[in-house]
Curated annotation (Swiss-Prot):
It comes from the Bacteria. This is Homoserine kinase. Keywords: Amino-acid biosynthesis, ATP-binding, Kinase, Nucleotide-binding, Threonine biosynthesis, Transferase. The keyword Ligase does not apply. The keyword Kinase applies. Transmembrane segments: none annotated.
Length: 327
């Protein structure tokens, strides 16, 4: 979450008058994240989140995201629910941006994910995948392999400003992943596609909610697992934590076993996941709007993760002989 577009108090008051959420007591921008402008609303009826959708989020995709949250919540997945205005609409316009109000979830995201947290997110991800099986709406993943070349083109001229040689490193990896090695015949379904620690809330050791579905789409289910391996299983010094990976994979596969092809493909999927986030972070790092209340994330973190994944020989390197085995 972040703030790119500010909202004047009188403009916000007029906007909120269309909703039955009580009187506004206070509001503040939320600086975390990199994609949309988000505000915490405190009203006489509690707390809500106001999101103004920016950048990579197409307005035509918003009904998908909002309907998905409703579907998952109805299926027992703890996630925010869209709040309708008095006309029954969940999508509106504020400050020239598409906007929605969603419910507030209790909990905090883990700043230093533990093994227990990794197990929790593995289980929650699998349950979300299962709950998404009967969601009727579809959305292609615009940030899968076909979407990486345009990102590279947007950043390549200045990539070496971040690290000398980065452009050639990215070009070589992209060419490899575009060479026909990327799998297309693995189980597919609804994926979150951005399940980082700041998108999972915990109360104690229990997952209390999953947030931020603005990258959700239909793609390889194991790709979502690979994204989580990269996001949850590296330490602050960039070392890969096999114990965390084992916990995440074991918890996931207790709910939804990975088949043999998914297990074999997981290291390749993790390479692709690392490149995808490296590229989007690089573009963001090089193009932060002046004066924006935003904290761009370091692309070099994902350079290191990609280098690790390039050297993974198989799923054993993630701490398991067969995904689903409990250590």
């Amino acid at each position: 979450m972040a703030v790119y577009t500010d909202v004047a108090a009188d403009e916000l008051a007029d906007f909120l008058s269309r909703y039955d959420i009580g009187d506004l007591l206070s509001y503040k921008g939320i600086a975390e994240g990199v994609e949309n402008s988000n505000f915490l609303l405190h009203t006489s009826r509690g707390y809500f989140i106001l999101t103004l959708y920016e950048k990579r989020v197409a307005r035509d995709d918003l009904p998908f995201f909002l309907s998905l949250m409703t579907h998952l919540a109805d299926s027992g997945i703890n996630c925010p629910q869209p709040v309708a205005d008095r006309e029954g609409r969940t999508l509106a316009t504020l400050a020239g941006r598409p906007a929605a109000i969603i419910s507030f979830l209790d909990g905090v995201w883990p700043r230093k994910p533990s093994v227990v947290h990794c197990a929790g997110v593995g289980q929650a991800l699998a349950k979300m995948h299962l709950a998404g099986r009967d969601f009727a709406m579809k959305r292609a993943n615009a940030l899968s392999v076909a979407g990486w070349r345009p990102l590279f083109a947007a950043a390549e001229a200045r990539a070496d400003e971040v690290q000398p040689g980065l452009r050639d490193f990215l070009a070589a990896e992209l060419s490899y992943l575009e060479s026909g090695v990327w799998p297309s015949d693995l189980p597919q379904g609804l994926i979150h596609a951005d399940l980082f620690p700041d998108n999972v809330f915990f109360i104690g050791d229990e997952v209390s909610g999953i947030i931020d579905f603005t990258f959700a789409c239909n793609d390889l289910l194991a790709y979502d697992v690979a994204i989580c391996l990269n996001a949850w299983c590296f330490e602050a010094d960039h070392a890969f934590n096999v114990t965390k990976a084992r916990a995440l994979l074991s918890a996931y596969t207790r709910e939804r076993p990975l088949d043999a092809a998914e297990q074999a493909a997981l290291p390749l999927l993790a390479r692709g996941a690392a490149l995808r986030f490296l590229l989007t972070r690089l573009v963001d790092w090089l193009n932060v709007p002046e004066g924006a209340l935003v904290k761009p994330k370091d692309p070099m973190e994902y350079v290191r993760k990609l280098r690790f994944q390039q050297n993974v020989a198989g799923i054993r390197d993630y701490g398991v002989e067969i995904a689903g085995a409990v250590a």
